[in-house]
Amino acid sequence: MARVKRGVIARRRHKKILKLAKGYYGARSRVFRVAKQAVIKAGQYAYRDRRQRKRQFRALWIARINAGARQNGLSYSRLIAGLKKATIEIDRKVLSDLAVNEKAAFAAIVEKAKAVLA
Protein backbone atom coordinates (compact mmCIF):
# COMPACT_ATOMS: atom_id res chain seq x y z
CA MET A 1 0.00 0.00 0.00
CA ALA A 2 1.41 3.36 -1.02
CA ARG A 3 1.86 6.11 1.54
CA VAL A 4 -0.68 8.92 1.22
CA LYS A 5 0.74 12.36 1.83
CA ARG A 6 -1.80 15.08 2.59
CA GLY A 7 0.45 18.12 2.43
CA VAL A 8 -1.38 19.57 -0.56
CA ILE A 9 -4.77 19.25 1.10
CA ALA A 10 -3.56 20.83 4.36
CA ARG A 11 -1.92 23.69 2.47
CA ARG A 12 -5.15 24.30 0.54
CA ARG A 13 -7.20 24.30 3.75
CA HIS A 14 -4.78 26.68 5.48
CA LYS A 15 -4.72 29.04 2.49
CA LYS A 16 -8.52 29.14 2.43
CA ILE A 17 -8.75 30.12 6.11
CA LEU A 18 -5.90 32.65 5.88
CA LYS A 19 -7.56 34.22 2.83
CA LEU A 20 -10.79 34.63 4.81
CA ALA A 21 -8.78 36.19 7.69
CA LYS A 22 -7.10 38.75 5.42
CA GLY A 23 -7.18 42.21 6.98
CA TYR A 24 -7.48 40.96 10.56
CA TYR A 25 -5.10 42.41 13.16
CA GLY A 26 -1.81 40.71 14.09
CA ALA A 27 -1.72 36.94 14.51
CA ARG A 28 -5.39 36.69 13.53
CA SER A 29 -4.35 37.15 9.90
CA ARG A 30 -1.05 35.21 9.99
CA VAL A 31 -1.23 32.23 12.35
CA PHE A 32 -3.52 29.43 11.16
CA ARG A 33 -4.79 28.37 14.60
CA VAL A 34 -5.69 31.90 15.64
CA ALA A 35 -7.01 32.81 12.19
CA LYS A 36 -9.32 29.79 12.17
CA GLN A 37 -10.86 30.83 15.49
CA ALA A 38 -11.23 34.43 14.28
CA VAL A 39 -12.92 33.33 11.03
CA ILE A 40 -15.35 31.06 12.90
CA LYS A 41 -16.22 33.86 15.35
CA ALA A 42 -16.65 36.33 12.48
CA GLY A 43 -19.05 33.89 10.81
CA GLN A 44 -21.08 33.62 14.01
CA TYR A 45 -21.29 37.41 14.30
CA ALA A 46 -22.29 37.70 10.62
CA TYR A 47 -25.03 35.07 11.01
CA ARG A 48 -26.41 36.73 14.15
CA ASP A 49 -26.25 40.26 12.75
CA ARG A 50 -28.01 39.38 9.49
CA ARG A 51 -31.03 38.68 11.68
CA GLN A 52 -30.48 41.68 13.97
CA ARG A 53 -30.22 44.03 10.98
CA LYS A 54 -33.90 43.44 10.18
CA ARG A 55 -34.90 44.30 13.77
CA GLN A 56 -32.67 47.37 13.88
CA PHE A 57 -34.03 48.79 10.63
CA ARG A 58 -37.62 48.26 11.77
CA ALA A 59 -36.82 50.08 15.04
CA LEU A 60 -35.23 52.94 13.06
CA TRP A 61 -38.27 53.21 10.75
CA ILE A 62 -40.62 53.28 13.75
CA ALA A 63 -38.56 56.00 15.47
CA ARG A 64 -38.65 58.14 12.30
CA ILE A 65 -42.38 57.62 11.79
CA ASN A 66 -43.03 58.48 15.45
CA ALA A 67 -41.01 61.71 15.16
CA GLY A 68 -42.86 62.70 11.97
CA ALA A 69 -46.25 61.79 13.42
CA ARG A 70 -45.64 63.82 16.59
CA GLN A 71 -44.72 66.86 14.47
CA ASN A 72 -48.20 66.49 12.98
CA GLY A 73 -49.91 66.10 16.35
CA LEU A 74 -50.34 62.32 16.51
CA SER A 75 -48.47 59.50 18.26
CA TYR A 76 -47.05 56.52 16.38
CA SER A 77 -49.56 54.03 17.77
CA ARG A 78 -52.53 56.30 16.98
CA LEU A 79 -51.18 56.87 13.45
CA ILE A 80 -50.87 53.12 12.79
CA ALA A 81 -54.35 52.52 14.23
CA GLY A 82 -55.74 55.28 11.99
CA LEU A 83 -54.03 53.89 8.90
CA LYS A 84 -55.43 50.42 9.61
CA LYS A 85 -58.96 51.86 10.03
CA ALA A 86 -58.60 53.88 6.82
CA THR A 87 -57.31 50.73 5.04
CA ILE A 88 -54.17 52.56 3.94
CA GLU A 89 -51.58 49.81 3.44
CA ILE A 90 -48.21 51.54 3.44
CA ASP A 91 -45.37 49.65 5.11
CA ARG A 92 -43.13 51.22 7.74
CA LYS A 93 -40.13 51.47 5.42
CA VAL A 94 -42.04 53.66 2.95
CA LEU A 95 -43.72 55.65 5.74
CA SER A 96 -40.36 56.47 7.33
CA ASP A 97 -38.96 57.53 3.95
CA LEU A 98 -41.95 59.82 3.46
CA ALA A 99 -41.55 61.23 6.99
CA VAL A 100 -37.90 62.11 6.30
CA ASN A 101 -37.92 63.16 2.63
CA GLU A 102 -41.53 64.00 1.66
CA LYS A 103 -42.94 65.89 4.64
CA ALA A 104 -45.98 67.21 2.76
CA ALA A 105 -47.02 63.76 1.55
CA PHE A 106 -46.51 62.33 5.05
CA ALA A 107 -48.61 65.15 6.54
CA ALA A 108 -51.42 64.31 4.09
CA ILE A 109 -51.35 60.66 5.17
CA VAL A 110 -51.41 61.70 8.84
CA GLU A 111 -54.43 63.93 8.17
CA LYS A 112 -56.30 60.99 6.60
CA ALA A 113 -55.51 58.87 9.66
CA LYS A 114 -56.68 61.71 11.95
CA ALA A 115 -59.95 62.03 10.02
CA VAL A 116 -60.74 58.34 10.48
CA LEU A 117 -59.91 58.45 14.21
CA ALA A 118 -62.04 61.54 14.89
UniProtKB/Swiss-Prot annotation:
Keywords recorded for this protein, A-Z: Ribonucleoprotein, Ribosomal protein, RNA-binding, rRNA-binding
GO cellular component assignments: ribonucleoprotein complex; ribosome
Gene3D superfamilies: 6.10.160.10, Ribosomal protein L20
UniProt cross-references to InterPro entries, sorted A to Z: Ribosomal_bL20, RIBOSOMAL_L20_CS, Ribosomal_protein_bL20_C
GO terms for biological process, alphabetical: ribosomal large subunit assembly; translation
Keyword Cell inner membrane: no
Pfam families: Ribosomal_L20
GO molecular function, one term: rRNA binding
Functional note: Binds directly to 23S ribosomal RNA and is necessary for the in vitro assembly process of the 50S ribosomal subunit. It is not involved in the protein synthesizing functions of that subunit.
Family: Belongs to the bacterial ribosomal protein bL20 family.
Name recorded for this polypeptide: Large ribosomal subunit protein bL20
Organism for this UniProt entry: Azotobacter vinelandii (strain DJ / ATCC BAA-1303)
Lineage: Bacteria, Pseudomonadati, Pseudomonadota, Gammaproteobacteria, Pseudomonadales
